[in-house]
Regions:
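Ribonuclease/tRNase effector modules and their secretory precursors
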Residues: 1-150
């Protein structure tokens, strides 16, 4: 297993590539194990987790940094993306019927439990970070759509 600094460095390198070149060719990488809250909720609620590890990918970083989000002020700061693997354990965790959502009150990080993607030309299913965005509605998670996971 990689150290947290190595994971943070890997995320920083991908973000740097995207800022400089508009893309990164880094393959999807593991940022750690699926945490206990998510695992127990999935087991109790028949949610399929494709793996016991959580992945991030350059493609998804590009998605959360796209120009349309930037124009609306919804892009999450690089430092928040870099620190997400460590900080997620202190964040609130929700489930919306399809994805898991981590939030720190200011931003939200969306995790798909069974995401299909190509890795080394082979289609696989992973528990994958799919996007992050700044929160604009502070009451967003108060509705019935979201289940808070303890």
């Amino acid at each position: 297993m990689e150290t947290d600094n190595s994971i943070e460095s890997q995320i920083a390198a991908v973000l740097s590539d995207i800022h400089q070149k508009g893309y990164s060719s880094v393959q999807p990488f593991i940022i750690g194990k699926v945490e206990q809250r998510m695992l127990l909720f999935a087991q109790a609620n028949a949610v399929t987790l494709a793996s016991d590890e959580l992945y991030m990918s350059a493609k998804q970083f590009q998605h959360c940094m796209r120009a349309s989000k930037n124009a609306k002020g919804l892009v999450v700061a690089d430092i928040d993306l870099i620190c997400f693997p460590q900080n997620r354990f202190q964040m609130d965790l929700y489930y919306d019927g399809e994805c898991f959502i981590y939030t720190d009150g200011l931003s939200k990080f969306i995790i798909h439990p069974n995401y299909k993607m190509k890795v080394n030309r082979e289609e696989v299913k992973l528990v994958n970070f799919i996007t992050a965005t700044r929160r604009t509605d502070k009451k967003e998670f108060n509705g019935k759509r979201y289940i808070k996971i303890q």
